[in-house]
């Protein structure tokens, strides 16, 4: 059923109809459209368009339709309706007859779809926040069990300084906490109802839009009708949040792909999140992580596409805005799936402590400790930096770690070096000395785990 047509003397070309129709993707707004319609029916009672009995009949029919949709949302796709609004109205008319045709009084599809999409966004943000916190909790739990797993930290993908696997986990907790904060901020901004703004100039009926917003669970009503039907900032903001969140998950995936490689061999992924090769029997591929990394690109693309769609649009509604949904639906679905998959990857991961410690001992990751030792002995840091660089060259030439160089060799570079240098160069000392807030010392890591648990409880 089309919601327009009186103005036209020819039927739409079937090719145009297929091009124009949006039911194949906006069917996902069915529940929100029905909920919005129930609220609108109540508003129409307050302005005398519907009697209380008529409203009750409409609400009962809409609630039946809502249950039918929840039981089988795919049924909607069998229809040739133009969009979800016409499908809901058609089904309502089937149930209550001519009374169903009164529901759209004073309402436009412009404010209707804007409301539906905001309601869907609110529901989806709640799901994303839950999945985000589940992953944070999984990371904290993994950190709790791996506080003593010493491994190399990297800059430029070169071994830099020793850290722990727990500290690595907590770095991603911080990223996810920022993602959580961004989603909460976005939720505040989209929590305003555009319903009652009509096509662009507002409704001709003196509906209490604040009351209407409250019925729908919004914090308030929007302030300007022209902006309300044109606004897709919430789409852009959620796509931006998703893009940033997926960058974090992609980096998480890349780190673990490397840690899982034969070259690093720091972790073993569970069989439940890996796959094999059709040719090479020995392969165990980190497909879950590679897909997380790969899916990041499609989310970034959705943000870029939406930016380009909106950048040249005049006020108010334009059909271009129909393009807001597919990218948003796909991006947020993808983000949600990747959050769940990242959590699953952590469930069953095995950290190979001996191999991690062996790698941390290599690469002269304790060189900074030797420089700090010299500074404590009164050597200016820049000079100490140069001295240690020369000592590293000597250690490489001898094929030894710094801590294995004889004292006489170390003293060739600085006479202030004494026997007390060797405890300083141990892995544990390297960790213990990083005791400022946010550092990798066991005390700081334990405190960070405790703080994260308290925040997530």
UniProtKB/Swiss-Prot annotation:
Record keyword Ubl conjugation present: no
EC supergroup of this enzyme: lyase
Localization per record: Cytoplasm
Catalytic activity: 2-(N(omega)-L-arginino)succinate = fumarate + L-arginine
Listed GO CC annotations: cytosol
Chief location category: cytoplasm
GO molecular function: argininosuccinate lyase activity
Pfam hit, one: ASL_C2
Known pathway: Amino-acid biosynthesis; L-arginine biosynthesis; L-arginine from L-ornithine and carbamoyl phosphate: step 3/3
InterPro entries registered for this protein in UniProt: Arg_succ_lyase_C (IPR029419), Argininosuccinate_lyase (IPR009049), Fumarase/histidase_N (IPR024083), Fumarate_lyase_CS (IPR020557), Fumarate_lyase_fam (IPR000362), Fumarate_lyase_N (IPR022761), L-Aspartase-like (IPR008948)
The UniProt record lists the keyword Signal: no
EC number in record: 4.3.2.1
Gene3D superfamilies per the UniProt record, alphabetical: Fumarase/aspartase (C-terminal domain) (1.10.40.30), Fumarase/aspartase (Central domain) (1.20.200.10), Fumarase/aspartase (N-terminal domain) (1.10.275.10)
Listed GO biological process terms: arginine biosynthetic process via ornithine; L-arginine biosynthetic process
Record key words, sorted: Amino-acid biosynthesis, Arginine biosynthesis, Cytoplasm, Lyase
Family under the similarity heading: Belongs to the lyase 1 family. Argininosuccinate lyase subfamily.
Name used for this protein in its record: Argininosuccinate lyase
Species classification: Bacteria, Pseudomonadati, Pseudomonadota, Gammaproteobacteria, Enterobacterales
Name of the gene: argH
């Amino acid at each position: 059923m089309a919601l327009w047509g009186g103005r036209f003397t020819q039927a739409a070309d079937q090719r145009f109809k297929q091009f124009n129709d949006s039911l194949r993707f906006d069917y996902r707004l069915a529940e929100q459209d029905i909920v919005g319609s129930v609220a609108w029916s109540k508003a129409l009672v307050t302005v005398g368009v519907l009697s209380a009995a008529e409203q009750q009949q409409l609400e009962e029919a809409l609630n039946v339709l809502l249950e039918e949709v929840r039981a089988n949302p795919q049924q909607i796709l069998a229809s040739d309706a133009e969009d979800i609004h016409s499908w809901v109205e058609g089904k309502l008319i089937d149930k209550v007859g001519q009374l169903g045709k009164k529901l759209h009084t004073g309402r436009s599809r412009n404010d209707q779809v804007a409301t539906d999409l905001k309601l869907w966004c609110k529901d989806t943000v709640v799901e994303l926040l839950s999945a985000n916190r589940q992953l944070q909790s999984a990371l904290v739990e993994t950190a709790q069990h791996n506080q003593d797993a010493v491994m190399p930290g990297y800059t430029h993908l070169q071994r830099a300084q020793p850290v722990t696997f727990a500290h690595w986990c907590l770095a991603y907790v911080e990223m996810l906490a920022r993602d959580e904060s961004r989603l909460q901020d976005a939720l505040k901004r989209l929590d305003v109802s555009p319903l009652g703004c009509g096509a662009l100039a507002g409704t001709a009926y003196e509906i209490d839009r604040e009351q209407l917003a409250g019925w729908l669970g919004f914090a308030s009503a929007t302030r300007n009708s022209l902006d309300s039907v044109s606004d897709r900032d919430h789409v852009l903001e959620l796509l931006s949040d998703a893009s940033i969140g997926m960058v974090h998950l992609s980096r998480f995936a890349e780190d673990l792909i490397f840690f899982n490689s034969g070259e690093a061999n720091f972790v073993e992924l569970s069989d439940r999140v890996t796959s094999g090769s059709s040719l090479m029997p020995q392969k165990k591929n980190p497909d879950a992580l590679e897909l997380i990394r790969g899916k990041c690109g499609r989310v970034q693309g959705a943000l870029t596409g939406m930016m380009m769609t909106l950048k040249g649009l005049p006020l108010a509604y334009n059909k271009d805005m129909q393009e807001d949904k597919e990218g948003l639906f796909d991006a947020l679905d993808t983000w949600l799936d990747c959050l769940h998959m990242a959590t699953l990857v952590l469930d069953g991961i095995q950290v190979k402590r001996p191999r991690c410690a062996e790698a941390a001992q290599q690469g002269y990751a304790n060189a900074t400790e030797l420089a700090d030792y010299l500074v404590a002995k009164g050597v200016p840091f820049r000079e100490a930096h140069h001295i240690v660089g020369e000592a590293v060259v000597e250690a490489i030439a001898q094929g030894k770690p710094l801590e294995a160089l004889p004292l006489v060799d170390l003293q060739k570079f600085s006479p202030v070096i004494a026997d007390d240098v060797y405890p300083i160069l141990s892995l544990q000392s390297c960790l213990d000395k990083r005791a400022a807030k946010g550092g990798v010392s066991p005390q700081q890591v334990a405190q960070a785990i405790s703080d994260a648990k308290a925040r997530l409880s």
